[in-house]
Amino acid sequence: MKIFKVLLITLMLLANTAFAAEFSAQVKTSEGIVQGVYDEKYNVVKWFGIPYAQQANREKRWALPQKAEKYTGVKDCSQYAPANLQFNGKNVIGQEGVLTLDVYRPDTGENNLPVLVFIHGGNNQTSNSRLWMGEKFAKEANAVYVSVQYRLGLLGFNNLPALANSNALNDSGNYGLIDQAYALEWIKKNIDKFGGDANNITVSGFSAGGRDVMAMLISPLFKDKFDKAISFSGGLTVADFAESQKIIAGKLAPLVVADGICADEKDAAEWLMQGSEEVRSYLMKLPGERLAPVMAGALIRMKSFPHLYGDGKVLPKEGFAAEKFNSVPLLMLASSDEFTSFLARDPYFKNRMDKVLKDKLITEEFVFANKYGSKFYGFFNGQESAEDIYAKYKAPIYVCMFDFGHDPAVVGETYAVKTGATHGIFLPFLTDQSYPYTVGTDVFAKSGPQELSDIFIASLAAFIRTGDPNNALLPEKWEAWTPQNRAETVFDADGKQAKVYQRSNDTSYDGILEELEADNSLNADSKNYIIKNILNGRWFSGELDTKYHNEN
């Protein structure tokens, strides 16, 4: 049986090399030889599921990543690795502690290509390295693209006292972020074998991954691990260390009660706050399938799932008020309808989405909630982040706004209202898929979106090469952000052509709050409910919650 499996793998690998190739799909890494696959459609080579560290399960749970084991022979990297353990809203899927990465590169003889590393989103609770499939980008940007998997949810972020072991890195509880640092070390050591330039690495991330990237800018752990940074819809978030411990203990308390250790949740939470071996043993023995659903569905609320702890070692206790930054050229992207995807999953709208555009009041409520939620969230992901770090940041900052998705003539009325320029709208412009959007690939195949895709990829390609996104396809210069110009480049398109232009964005929290206060387009009860129950407690809601005395 073993001989048959070896023969089968050998035949499969030979089948993938049956046509002329310029770059070998067999690459010798620090752990051994990995065998990738050729993609004739895109003319790229790709490797899936390369371990950058040992699987962090069993006794390695809530421990620092450990050096990947060496392997003999040829490791088949033609199939995706499992996702990390997570709750997808219905079921627990994946495996615990999958620390792997995927690599894509053009099938050419070129070396010293720029490297783009991607940290996937999903609130640091869900998703996997396939969120952004890299074939199109690797080919058109002529770059090496790497997508990283890291520990998620409470398996990736947990700072309860019982898990401390007197190692400051481990005691931070930021295991998922430390995984990313370890992945960047592996990439720096090995990427030249894939034709990448180890001295030209850009780290990027979307949503939670974007917030992770922004956190890297203040983390001593990430010093000299990358040369440029891109944050796609990721603002500035750091959780208070002590408060996070209390929240996590409270969320795990029902499991302790269910297991008969404590009589009620109050006692259970107090027990979990002990730094005892008894608590540690209990946590280590908990099945991952029971841990994954805890705190699920946080939907950009830090108190629903605290992570990125300001521990004083991995992340400064003072967060982004820190004096020192890992200052590298930085590009930040926001979208003009960031909030629609979160509204669609909010308990209030989740079962009412089919009535949007059919029921007058529900439509008005949705439009109102999206208008202000997206104004706040878009500002948080771009302009506000630039404002907050500019004085201490010693490298250029570029800001852009994706505005595609509003024109019913291009995307249809339903998509224009319910989705618009939603959180992650940039992704279909980097792939040939509409995923994760249901509008369909025919929309993105129109000449306008295709031209926009060309310009966007060219801008990212220029940035990862030089630290400056300007290129021949841009119709006007993309200015670096300053407090004086507040410059951002807008990316949009109609059905026939791209619409890319520079503008000054003078949005402010005070301005949005004043507009919201004066807006009487919605009845008072609905307006009050949305402010106090839908817009509250989000990454961007601090000033809103203070003004309206919201619970968060």
What are the residue ranges of the model-derived segments?
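Sec-dependent signal peptide recognition
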Residues: 2-9
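Hydrophobic h-region of N-terminal signal peptides that target proteins for export
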Residues: 11-18
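Catalytic-loop region of hydrolases
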Residues: 21-110, 283, 474, 514-518, ...
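A structural signal for well-ordered alpha-helical segments within the folded catalytic domains
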Residues: 45, 95-99, 178-185, 211, ...
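Serine-hydrolase-like catalytic core of hydrolytic proteins
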Residues: 82-273, 315-344, 395, 453, ...
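Short, solvent-exposed turn/loop segments enriched in Gly/Ser/Thr/Pro and often Arg
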Residues: 151-153, 204-208, 401-408, 475-482
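Substrate-gating cap/lid region and adjacent catalytic-acid/histidine neighborhood
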Residues: 278-450, 459, 466, 541, ...
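Alpha/beta-hydrolase-fold serine-hydrolase catalytic core, especially in secreted/extracellular enzymes
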Residues: 313, 391-397, 434, 438-552
